[in-house]
A protein has these predicted regions:
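Beta-rich, blade/repeat-based domains predominating
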Residues: 1-21, 40-54, 61
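Short loop/turn segments that connect beta-strands within beta-propeller blades
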Residues: 27-32, 70-72
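Blade-level signature of beta-propeller repeat domains, shared across WD40, Kelch, NHL, RCC1
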Residues: 45-82
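WD40 beta-propeller blade core
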Residues: 25-26, 65
Length: 82
């Protein structure tokens, strides 16, 4: 399946989440492919959210999908500004 990488985010463990063909591809900090979180549409971009920062929101072709995970997103300094 064809497709291009667009969105990219990291979790608190250093895993990398990248939108691509068939959904969100997950890689370990060492670069090992851990799996794909399937999406019903072409995945375009993504961001962390939710009260505990453990939900991944993915903007697809015509919808936004939310995936609850067992890991939190990596909070970078600019996300904690008030």
């Amino acid at each position: 399946a064809g497709g291009l990488v667009d969105g990219m985010k990291c979790d608190e463990r250093g895993n990398v989440y990248v939108t691509g063909p068939r959904g969100i591809w997950v890689f370990s900090p060492a670069g090992r492919h851990l799996g794909v979180i399937g999406m019903p549409e072409h995945a375009g971009n993504l961001n962390w959210g939710g009260r505990d920062w453990d939900e991944l929101f993915c903007a697809c072709s015509s919808s936004i999908y939310r995936v609850k995970l067992k890991v939190r997103g990596n909070r970078v300094a600019y996300m904690n500004m008030r």
